[in-house]
Amino acid sequence: MSWKAIAKAAQAEVLDAIPTKWKLDPAKYRTLTDVTSVPRECGILSDAQLSITDLTALEVVKRIESRELTAVQALEAFGARTAIAHQLVNCLMDWFYEDGLRQAEELDKSFKATGKLKGPLHGVPVALKDFHFVAGRPTTTGYVSRRDFRPEHDSALVKTLRDAGAVFYCKTTMPQSGMAIETVSNLWGRTLNPYNTALSAGGSSGGDAVLVALKGTPITPSTDLGGSIRVPAAFNGLYAIRPTSDRIPKGGMDNINSGQISIKLSCGPICHSMEDLESFTKLINAYPENQNDPTSVPVPWKTVKPIEGKLTIGLMKWDKVVMPHPPVIRALEHTKRTLEKAGHEVVEFDVPFDCWDAIQTTFDTYYQSGHSGTLSTLEATGEPLIPAFEDLIKVFGSKEISAAESQQLNVKARIFREKFRDAWDATTKLTSTGRPVDALICPTAPAVGYPHDFNVYWGYTSLFNLLDYPSVILPVANFKVNPQDDPVASNYKPLETNPYDKPNHELYKPELFSSQPSTIQVVGRPFQDEELIKVSSVMDDLLRAM
């Protein structure tokens, strides 16, 4: 069977599994570009179900505990909305609702008998990215040749969530290989942005993000090696965190290039609130259960006191490689004014090294084997590379390196980390408090979104994978791109020293991004995830109050 035939059958299998009662008339919505209102207006969900799907994960658990809601009712509501979302934006690669229903029924039965919740996610419908191992369910990593691969066990993270009472019922799309800032594969097709289907959903956790945005699930455990949690969250206006990578157990997760551990995968939530973000991150920190897990460091979750007094925040507007579009800069300046109005302090921060050198080091580290794992997996069926991956090879090359060269990359990474640490420490000279900044704010990407197959610059997120600094994505409430506030920066002359700045600059037209949400990235120091969350919560309260 050809790869095209395999892909066609796989996509049809997912769509056919959706119950008839939750099917949309495709002709009715084909011309829509903003589909965010369809779940509420299509008539499939009752008013009660719409109210359920407006709940955060913590609110679902509270309603179940107070007996206002059952796990089965929660799954029915979110399951219906997930089915609608998939038909609008193509976000699923597996649908196993009946399995989820059995889980929910067991939770309800147990709670009725004992009056005790199974755990902090009791009855919460949680979608899982393709990447996660779920016993008996397909894990493809977006490759046609892996269509029939089914692991025999849950990954460590999935086990943690299952033990906490999460209900699993579907898996979401990711791009071929996972190494793309857009979610598209030959196997599953293209996942669309619900705010503008002509724009990218982000990647690699694009299926997760669009499903959360359309409220088919309140939260997802997403993964990030170069921006894969943060970029999709940003392009869909959501909350997210990329924790310090060593804090999260990753045993049993899929990875074609698993031998590369110099820049480590991280896992964290995409969700609708800081409260869910904090609760979920604490849960997947998984201490003390992870004390013998070789993929993480057993660090207890710290109790951090609420912040009193003045915050000091570093502002990094751009990295001297790719100039962000005007609305990205405006969102940062808006955040700065909001903080200063509330009595906090914001100081300028510059990265203390060449960020173009840093991203080249990052990609050289990712692909020390010269893409051999990816290419051999494609050769099994003859499927082609997706454009996003081809672009990365054109820019960064495809060369297998020696052991000595690999060691030199590790030396460079260590030097980058030392320089960044020293620059952060040196902010004591800039702040009125005499202490280093509490966090940095910076762009997540050079734009609020991108057209499909645009060659996107990863540097604003991948930098913090190289350094292994935790970072949070915060939505900027009531902030929309418009020509009056965000005119084209006609006086800016793009840099010729890299292949990204000029195309990024030439792309910008305010009307192209008028429906896109805006976000900022908040960065903390390694293993200070709890402190970062507290700082981000203060900022979130201020931004939502504006």
Swiss-Prot record:
GO terms for molecular function: hydrolase activity. The keyword Hydrolase applies. It is an enzyme of class 3 (hydrolase). Its EC number is 3.5.1.-. Coiled coil: none annotated. Induction: Highly expressed under trichothecene-producing conditions. The active site is at K129, S204, S228. Pathway: Mycotoxin biosynthesis. Keywords: Hydrolase. Transmembrane segments: none annotated. Belongs to the amidase family. Amidase; part of the gene cluster that mediates the biosynthesis of butenolide, a mycotoxin that shows antibiotic activity but does not seem to play a major role in the spread of head blight in wheat. Butenolide is derived from glutamic acid via a 4-acetamido-2-butenoic acid intermediate. This is Amidase FG08078.
